[in-house]
A protein has these predicted regions:
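Boundary/entry segment of secreted carbohydrate-active catalytic domains
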Residues: 2-58, 62-72
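Substrate-binding cleft of secreted/luminal carbohydrate-active enzymes
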Residues: 15-23, 27-41, 45, 259-344
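Alpha-helical scaffolding within the catalytic cores
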Residues: 19, 46-55, 75-79, 134, ...
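Acidic (Asp/Glu)-rich catalytic clusters
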Residues: 25-27, 53-61, 79-90, 136-148, ...
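Structural recognition of the beta-strand scaffold that forms the well-ordered cores
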Residues: 32-36, 63-69, 90-95, 152-156, ...
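Aromatic-lined carbohydrate-recognition surfaces of secreted/lumenal glycan-active proteins
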Residues: 35-37, 155-156, 181-214, 258-271, ...
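Substrate-binding cleft of extracellular glycoside hydrolase catalytic domains
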Residues: 71-73, 77-194
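Aromatic- and acid-rich polysaccharide-binding/catalytic face
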Residues: 215-239, 295
Length: 344
């Protein structure tokens, strides 16, 4: 019941965005929101069905968090964000953005994709250069049916600890990455006047590390440039890794006064019968965070979340029933500022 003061990257964020931010910080005291990537678009054995998700097929309820990719954004995805907002859910946007230097038609994968780590960030940072102007055109905002900005969590340069992407550990220097992150924030916030974004950084945390907090803060752009700290956790069955990294991210959250969450996780079509209650829920109860987001269910060989017929389906129903897990119907108004909280 003590007054709480939080700070955001954008002091001019809309009231709804500030309220979402405050609730993301506080909700970890209540439980953990479950999210699923691309859940309204497709699932196992279906594509494009209205108001459907694999999670809803199992539980009758949608995930609390809708994770989607800004890559090839279209009206369908934008409408899913609008519908999620109307129902009271939360949207988090990742961005597998093409390499602006090498992208183009008739390229052989991975040339031109996110996975093409050809160096380009140094060119983007040159004001007025071809790559600088091209990249500025890519950045855009999203609005609801009435033209009001919908609050979203945005993680544009995810897994920057890795070498697979063109903004990552081998394609940029530390100074270039930090400058690039700040360039994105400054352009959206100060030039475009976008005030509905919660800026999230999300290193990949798959192993037990000697200095997990140091890895979480790898190439940290500065407290004034990050709102939310996520981590992408593909640790397989290494429970020690998940526990130790959850402990570290909770410590960072307490120190920085910022919300945190597991922004990607899951086992690719390799769930045990007690996966959700043992491998996922048990550690989260010990080290609570705002959300845990399973990666997508594209097909039976590439499925990270639950679905009917999966070995973990019955266990997920128990996961759903647990008072600690939060799904869409469990959410109070995430876009109303809780009492006793101020944002600066």
């Amino acid at each position: 019941n003590q007054p709480l003061e939080l700070s955001m990257v954008d002091p001019q964020a809309t009231p709804e965005t500030k309220a979402l931010y405050a609730n993301l910080y506080l909700i970890a005291r209540q439980g953990v929101m479950f999210g699923h990537h691309d859940y309204p678009s497709y699932g196992i054995g279906w594509r494009g069905d209205e108001d459907r998700s694999d999670v809803k097929d199992l539980t009758g309820d949608h995930p609390a968090v809708y994770s989607l990719d800004m890559h090839r954004i279209n009206d369908t995805k934008i409408n899913f964000v609008k519908e999620t907002y109307k129902r009271g859910g939360v949207s988090i946007l990742v961005w597998h953005q093409n390499n602006p230097l090498t992208e183009g038609p008739d390229k052989q994968y991975p040339v031109g994709t996110s996975w093409d780590n050809t160096k380009v960030v140094d060119q983007i940072l040159i004001e007025g250069s071809e790559m600088n102007l091209k990249y500025k055109k890519i950045l855009h905002a999203m609005k609801d049916d009435d033209g009001r900005p919908i609050p979203v969590i945005f993680r544009p340069l995810h897994e920057h600890t890795q070498s697979w992407n063109w903004w990552g550990s081998t394609a940029t220097t530390e100074a270039e990455f930090i400058a690039f992150w700040r360039f994105i924030v400054n352009y959206l916030r100060d030039v475009r006047g976008v005030h509905n974004v919660i800026y999230a950084i999300s290193p990949q945390m798959d192993e037990v590390y000697d200095n997990p907090k140091g890895r979480l803060l790898y190439r940290w752009p500065g407290d004034d440039y990050v709102d939310f700290l996520g981590m992408d956790c593909y640790h397989g069955r290494n429970a020690n890794a998940f526990y130790s990294n959850l402990e570290a991210i909770c410590q960072v959250s307490s120190y920085l006064g910022k919300p945190v969450g597991v922004t990607e996780t899951g086992l690719e079509n390799d769930h045990t019968s007690d996966y959700w209650t043992s491998d996922v829920l048990r550690p989260l109860k010990q080290y609570p965070v705002s959300m845990v987001v399973a990666w997508r269910n594209d097909n039976p060989r590439h499925a990270y979340g639950p679905y009917p017929g999966d070995a973990s389906a019955d266990d997920f129903k128990q996961f759903y029933k647990d008072i600690f897990t939060l799904f869409e119907s469990d959410l109070t108004d995430m876009y109303k500022m809780p009492e006793g909280v101020t944002i600066r």
